[in-house]
């Protein structure tokens, strides 16, 4: 009975190891479950030429109509090759986890010895018993690593969706702003041409004419910058959507969506972020995995090589010999202290990283929500106060012009001012939708938040260019 214990224990370990195999495609389903609530379309992985052709046909169909924000996200998740490459990491890690759960291959040795006329043949079959006994623990560690990779890939999916939505907002706003900058340039050109003709007729002095010419030059510069921003925003959107060739002729809506009636009120936003942010979950899993790695290091600290073998010797002059042998590593020079110290430091490092991730998550979501509320208030102020006021001023100026109380130059200058206010309103609406995308991302993962000072300087420069 004692002889049967070792084979039975090895058989039990083998059964446990066989149960630890990973079902192909299970990781993709897990990523889908993590992202489906935040990205409506389901993820697909292109593994063949037929899959690529099917994706291309789907994208072509979606591009027949002007691209909305949700459609842009759908195309990006379907067609972005960088995301497809990242999704392949799931299959790679699944294969590595399955490989780690497999039984170690046994070793075989053969020897031939001669002594006079005697020939002795030695055959041995051995297996790494230390690796076999730690196989369940190693399999659980690999499964934890697979879960971490799943969350990392899910984070990449959500980041791409947020970036595509923000790029769409910027592209539509840049297109709408370019249209108004054309109006500013046309008004400035008409004013400059009228000033030139009136100077030729002797009704204008050189200073007034040069002033109008300066307005026209500034408007032309503002138009060139608007065209540059529009091209850059469109190209960035095309990159994120994975578009090229004939697909670059995609159409966008004429304007951004209207401002919502009221902003979202989220008093428990920090708790919500900590509960559902994937980077916080990944940091927690990393700390747990490091703790299990520390346990494995402690188990194998002194003996990391422990082999059991069966031996069979035959000779032409002696009876056959059978038996077993055990070989193990003697910890004479390396007691495993350095590996244990490294594992402990890695564990403490993972704890600090998890705490830092949670602290940063709280701060990011507070900042994102503050930007969201401030951007909403600014956009609403433009919509309800500044734009109607500029429109009323323009109406009064037109009445004064019809009554010959002001001249055409004052009317054109007021038209430029009104268009500039509308353009500023577009930028405020753009900033709101960008802030909303940042807030949505900050609730589920790392968000790329803008620098308020830089944004303010840029807005001021654009407004000045329009006058």
Q: Which positions does each model-derived feature cover?
A:
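Short segments within alpha-helical structural elements
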Residues: 189, 218-245, 353, 358, ...
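Short, charged, amphipathic alpha-helical segments
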Residues: 87, 140-143, 206-214, 408-416
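Short, Lys/Arg-rich amphipathic alpha-helical interaction segments
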Residues: 126-133, 137-143
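A small-residue-enriched
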Residues: 20-43, 74-131, 234-243, 270-338, ...
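Periplasmic alpha-helical coiled-coil/stalk elements that build and connect Gram-negative outer-membrane
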Residues: 20, 135-137, 151-272, 368-371, ...
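Alpha-helical heptad-repeat coiled-coil segments that mediate oligomerization/polymerization in large
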Residues: 205, 361, 368, 404-408
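Terminal intrinsically disordered/low-complexity segments used for targeting and assembly
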Residues: 1-75, 227-272, 440-467
């Amino acid at each position: 009975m004692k002889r049967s214990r070792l084979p039975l224990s090895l058989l039990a370990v083998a059964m446990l190891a066989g149960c630890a195999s990973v079902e192909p495609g299970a990781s993709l389903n897990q990523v889908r479950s993590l992202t489906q609530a935040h990205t409506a379309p389901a993820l697909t992985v292109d593994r063949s030429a037929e899959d690529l052709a099917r994706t291309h046909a789907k994208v072509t169909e979606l591009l027949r109509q002007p691209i909305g924000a949700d459609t842009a996200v759908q195309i990006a998740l379907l067609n972005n090759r960088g995301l497809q490459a990242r999704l392949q990491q799931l299959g790679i890690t699944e294969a590595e986890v399955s490989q780690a759960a497999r039984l170690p291959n046994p070793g075989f040795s053969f020897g031939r010895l001669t002594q006079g006329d005697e020939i002795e043949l030695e055959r041995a079959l051995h297996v790494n018993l230390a690796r076999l006994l730690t196989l369940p623990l190693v399999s659980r560690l690999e499964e934890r690593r697979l879960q971490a990779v799943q969350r990392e890939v899910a984070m990449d999916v959500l980041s791409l969706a947020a970036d595509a939505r923000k790029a769409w907002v910027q592209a539509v706003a840049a297109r709408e702003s370019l249209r108004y900058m054309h109006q500013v340039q046309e008004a400035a050109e008409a004013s400059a041409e009228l000033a030139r003709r009136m100077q030729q007729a002797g009704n204008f002095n050189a200073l007034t004419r040069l002033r109008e010419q300066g307005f026209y030059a500034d408007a032309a510069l503002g138009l060139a910058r608007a065209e540059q921003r529009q091209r850059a925003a469109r190209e960035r959107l095309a990159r994120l959507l994975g578009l090229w060739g004939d697909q670059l002729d995609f159409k966008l809506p004429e304007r951004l969506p209207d401002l919502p009636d009221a902003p979202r009120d989220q008093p428990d936003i920090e708790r919500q972020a900590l509960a559902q942010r994937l980077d916080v979950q990944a940091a927690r899993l990393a700390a747990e995995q490091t703790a299990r790695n520390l346990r494995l290091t402690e188990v194998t600290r002194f003996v990391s090589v422990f082999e059991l073998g069966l031996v069979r010797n035959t000779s032409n002059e002696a009876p056959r010999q059978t038996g077993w042998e055990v070989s193990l590593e003697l910890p004479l020079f390396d007691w495993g202290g350095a590996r244990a110290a490294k594992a402990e430091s890695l564990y403490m490092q993972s704890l600090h990283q998890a705490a830092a991730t949670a602290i940063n998550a709280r701060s990011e979501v507070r900042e994102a929500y503050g930007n969201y509320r401030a951007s909403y208030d600014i956009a609403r102020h433009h919509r309800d106060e500044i734009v109607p006021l500029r429109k009323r001023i323009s109406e009064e100026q037109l009445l004064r012009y019809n009554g010959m109380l002001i001249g055409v130059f004052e009317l054109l200058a007021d038209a430029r001012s009104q268009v500039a206010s509308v353009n500023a309103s577009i930028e405020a609406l753009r900033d709101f939708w960008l802030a909303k995308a940042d807030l949505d991302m900050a609730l589920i993962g790392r968000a790329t938040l803008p620098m308020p000072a830089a944004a303010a300087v840029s807005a001021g420069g654009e407004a000045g260019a329009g006058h």
